[in-house]
């Protein structure tokens, strides 16, 4: 299989029927999961054509999630930066405090359509775990969330919220005890329970149809942003910025703009402590194509093809792979991918808090940091939108620890 960058232009008409985004994506799974994935693909295609499914989903997004989320003009930050007008797409104001609920509500509805009676999920920062537990509580479905032991330490508020919502938390002690290991354990569970269980994957990763399906559920972010920009300042933005771990908030924001060539899109990965392998989580910046969790995409791996350990202070970006559509956008040069160090993200967290009164998630703060740099090189007649993917309440204790302060 070729790993050379594609020369084609990025298209919104992906994936193909095999789940391929150019060279990327596909389905690399044991035979055990093939039937479950075929069933999911078939049911999702039926749901997309079912007006009643869309009406129910739209109704829940409005009355339960609280959509549309606002597009907020960060005037003080814009003035201080002295460049482009900075706008925040406020996904942090959704029910549960992040974009993750857009996807879990959709997949929970599919769970019911398929007649499944149990849900499993993985989580890193805990936001997908909370969103999964919330959706399951709403629909009366039992939920087990797999979470790395290190992430449980970093994200105690979200762990407690999941328990209050009735979810069973399964701590993963293997490997680096982070998101990658949580996905591994969730996959193992699913292989032994496919008859009655649906796995709500939380990002645009995994085997087909998950990358497409999660992107579609999250694309409400970009669709609203397009409409809000036109209503607010009369045209599309000049630049859109989002953080990228697995990449669901970025995919949801970017996808509706893919064919708008005048809109620059920038994805920001976790640069961690340094560019040294093991010190960051930036597969699009430093990785190579390979297979991880059932999909072919850019991955942090060694010369033998073994997945490398990665690092980010933000649990939600601490992942060695990325969604295949992001790999496709990278190789077609439709999206620019850059990385942001831990210290830069922490500074941006503090700057947004003090200038706008908004506590952004540490994941989101990576996007804020680089958006500030980009905006500073633009004119004050231009407009830049940041996908503010989640709120930072969950990170309070970890930020206190990073700053050496008592909690």
From Swiss-Prot:
Biased composition (Polar residues): 1-11
Gene label: trpB
EC number in record: 4.2.1.20
CDD domains: Trp-synth_B
Function: The beta subunit is responsible for the synthesis of L-tryptophan from indole and L-serine.
Cofactor: pyridoxal 5'-phosphate
The keyword Transmembrane helix belongs to this UniProt entry's keyword annotation: no
Gene Ontology cellular-component annotations: cytoplasm
Superkingdom of this protein's organism: Bacteria
Family: Belongs to the TrpB family.
Annotated Gene3D superfamilies: 3.40.50.1100
Species whose genome carries this gene: Rhodopirellula baltica (strain DSM 10527 / NCIMB 13988 / SH1)
Region Disordered, annotated ranges: 1-25
Any single GO BP term: L-tryptophan biosynthetic process
Entry-linked InterPro entries: Trp_synth_b_CS, Trp_synth_beta, Trp_synth_beta/beta-like, TrpB-like_PALP, TrpB-like_PALP_sf
Residues bearing PTM N6-(pyridoxal phosphate)lysine: 100
Pathway named in the protein's UniProt entry: Amino-acid biosynthesis; L-tryptophan biosynthesis; L-tryptophan from chorismate: step 5/5
Any one GO molecular-function label of the UniProt entry: tryptophan synthase activity
Catalytic activity: (1S,2R)-1-C-(indol-3-yl)glycerol 3-phosphate + L-serine = D-glyceraldehyde 3-phosphate + L-tryptophan + H2O
Listed name of the protein: Tryptophan synthase beta chain
The organism's taxonomic lineage, starting at the top: Bacteria, Pseudomonadati, Planctomycetota, Planctomycetia, Pirellulales
